[in-house]
Amino acid sequence: MAQYFGFIPSDKLNDMINEAERIINSNEQVDYYPYRNELTQQIARELIDNLLVGLIDVIPNPERQAAMGKIVNTIERTTETLLNVLLGKDKNEDIIPSFEFLKNESMFLDNDGERRVGFKLSDRAAQTINEGYAAVTPDNVDLVKFKAALETMNEVALTHFITRFTETLKLGMIKRGSIPVAKAGIDKGMSLALNKLLPQLPDAGLNRLAGFYRPFFIEKAE
């Protein structure tokens, strides 16, 4: 069995994926870069929506909800700015590696045959995440293990969708050098969100949080 992380794309994102596949597979004589750029931006938006926006509803205090909302907005703006800088008007042959990465390494079918946007987890990451969620029960919560699971989830998602994806882009030294800086900023924002959120929640709230995230993790036969 293999462990995967993935979210169910919106109808809009599904349509964008299907359209990009159709254009590539039919060798349609159009510029590919607008499809790559729009698809990448939409995946980023939905990834943030699934991982972070839902957290706001878990917070019981309205003032803290507002503070969390500001953190999430900062992450959204940073991500959008990074992608606007990196995604340019590339030649079609330079777009293909990005499409192949998104299609072959960033999507999978879950056990119900439904498309998800995500990726296979390493054994080590899967173990940390599984142990963290198993440590959250109605009777007891091991906050250290649960926090480690959430941090691992964020790190592997950032590594896949920022570090590995941008390796498929044809970039100059300056643009490529901006990627680790932007990734560190996004990672800092996500860590800040967790550090603000977790101490506020009683065990019941931590169980709700774990319940919110569990559906993103899929175990399926290889």
Regions found by a protein language model. Give the residues of each.
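Protein-protein interaction and targeting regions used for scaffolding, dimerization, and localization
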Residues: M1-E222
